Structures are given as C-alpha cells and as structure tokens.
Design a protein with these regions (language model features):
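Structural signal for the C-terminal ends of transmembrane alpha-helices
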Residues: 1-6, 115-124, 186-193
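Hydrophobic alpha-helix feature that most strongly marks membrane-spanning transmembrane helices
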Residues: 46, 66, 116-122, 126-129, ...
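Transmembrane helix-bundle signature of multi-pass membrane transporters/permeases
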Residues: 84, 99, 139-143, 171-174
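A juxtamembrane structural motif centered on a specific transmembrane helix
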Residues: 146-200
Length: 200
C-alpha cells in the first residue's frame, strides 16, 4: 500500500514538472518574474556592469559592514543608516549592526541565533508527541532560513529578497509572527521531558 502511494506521488511530481516546463517554454505572455525581480537578479549577477543606482542599497550595505571593522564604530554611531542604506531598520539592519558593533557584534548576534536554534531543536527532540516535535523543528527551520537569507542578502551572497531579520528588524506582522512562534515553542517545552531548574 505504501509503495503504490509513493509511486503515484513520484509520477505526479514528474508530470507537474513536465507541464511547468511546457507552459514556461511555449507561453511567453506569462510573466514569471516581474521587472524589479529581474533587475535585482541581473544586478546581482553582473556586479561590475550594473548601473550604480540599481546596486545602491547593496553597495552601501557592504560599505557599512566593511567600515565597522572588528569592534565597530559604537552603538548609535552609524553613518550609512542616514539615507545611504535604505530600509536600514528593516531588511538591512544586519549591515548597521556590523557598522556599529563590528565583526564581534555580528558574531554575537549570529551566535545568539545559533543558541536559539540549538535549544529549539533540543526541545523538539524531547517533545512529548510527534506534533510538538514537528512544530519545534519547523519553527527552528523557518527562523534559521530567515536569518541565513537575510545575512546572505546583506553580504551580497544572494540577490535582494526583502526578508527581515527575526527579532531585530522593525515590522509589526513579522515581529508578531515570530513572537507567536516563540510562544508555541515555549508551550512545547513546557510539556517536554526537560530537566527542571526550578520547582515551582
């Protein structure tokens, strides 16, 4: 029963890919990428040939990271956040962290995220049921991918995507969802088989 069902999933997946390739190749009127998406990818692939206006945000993000040095310019002393790095309080806040707190501050922030993710995985491994385990793992994967994508965009490893840095970026809905996820994780940890530090 299980093998037959898996075979149908594989056949369905292959058929979906074939249909998608046919649609993309024969129907040029279907916009796969919007113009601004194509510009972002093109400016990321052709860094030297691209007009500086299209790479303004990314270039100044790299300037901010580079000018921070090892210990940074000091908290609140960033120059790039004043109309050079647009969205410096949302998508590109990691570059301002790098400018103000330097390499040490960036490592500290990434270390805190690593500790959070490791603790979430530990909670998932000790969860009472499969739902709690999958919930904890899913939340940690989502936060880990969001952090990795944000840092990759800020360091020009990936094209600009507009993904915020959890807990640091300004934004109501993103912060609300992230804090809600932490509430779910704490609920799983409350019922998990974890060593208790306090007995209240």
């Amino acid at each position: 029963m299980g093998e037959g069902r898996a075979r149908w999933f594989v056949i369905g997946g292959i058929a979906a890919v074939i249909v998608l390739v046919i649609v993309i190749n024969f129907y040029d009127d279907i916009p796969i990428l919007k113009d601004y998406m194509a510009d972002r990818i093109g400016s990321w692939l052709n860094k030297d040939l691209t007009d500086t206006d299209k790479r303004w945000q990314t270039n100044h993000s790299l300037f901010a990271l580079g000018s921070g040095g090892f210990f940074g310019s000091g908290l609140g002393n960033s120059k790039q956040k004043y109309f050079y790095v647009s969205e410096s309080h949302t998508d590109f806040i990691f570059s301002i962290i790098g400018e103000e707190l330097g390499f040490v501050g960036c490592c500290l922030v990434l270390g805190l995220f690593a500790l959070l993710i490791l603790r979430g995985i530990y909670i998932g491994m000790r969860a009472r049921d499969r739902f709690g385990a999958l919930l904890a793992f899913g939340i940690m994967v989502q936060i880990g991918l969001q952090v990795a994508l944000n840092v990759a965009v800020v360091t020009d490893t990936l094209p600009n995507t507009g993904i915020s840095l959890p807990f640091f970026s300004y934004g109501g809905s993103s912060t609300l969802v992230t804090l809600g996820e932490m509430g779910f994780l704490l609920s799983v940890s409350r019922q998990a088989d974890l060593p208790r530090l306090y007995s209240f």
